[in-house]
Amino acid sequence: GLAQALDGAQVVVDVANSPSFEDQAVMAFFETSGRTLLAAEAAAGVTHHLALSVVGTDRLADSGYFRAKVAQEALIKASKVPYTILRATQFFEFIESIVNAGADGDTVRLSPALIQP
């Protein structure tokens, strides 16, 4: 399990991502996985947590996904494990999933958020 995977680890690189972009599901994913991972890290004596996040996460409160990322970051900051949060720019290889999440038949709802490659 997770305890065995972290045995002897000094650093955890957390690139976890939710399999769903639905507001409640993505929040549940980041809160549950974050708490579970951080508790296991503390028990294993991990000395640093590196988490991948997204530039502008804190400015996109209309998005359930980004609210969940803010919650994930808050859990990391509140933990006893020293951390780095790396906010990278958008990953445009996910654009199809983002568009499909806003599609309903022949209608696509676009986010009002400004993003660029």
Spans of features found by a protein language model:
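NAD(P)H-binding glycine-rich loop region in Rossmannoid oxidoreductase-like domains
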Residues: 1-44, 55-61
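Oxidoreductase cofactor-interface core, primarily capturing Rossmann-like NAD(P)-dependent enzymes
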Residues: 20, 42-47, 58-117
